[in-house]
Amino acid sequence: MTAAAAEPVTSGHRNEVYLVGEVITVPDERTFADGRDVVTFRIDVRTESESRPIRDSFDVTVANARSRKAALTWDVGDTVEIEGVVRRRFHRVGAGSRAFVVIEATRAKRLRR
């Protein structure tokens, strides 16, 4: 291995997400086409701006076993903390495809019911 190959690439780019929000759909376990088991749900994140409150909803997938197990115990209305990355996904719709964004959680925990 050369010295250049051993050094990490440092582009300055980052894909990190930290959200605290309210669960707005019942967490659902499913198996993706590639065989991965995941739990999916949506969260609502409310923030205040100077002019008005803002609500953003995010689709979240959780793949690691520990967080999947925890997410399956959550109820709509629970406040949760999500750490992860943003992923752009595609799926076929008729003759075309549709793009959507999902938060892929690497860590997820309930803060309060």
Protein language model regions, located:
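OB-fold and OB-like single-stranded nucleic-acid-recognition modules
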Residues: 1-113
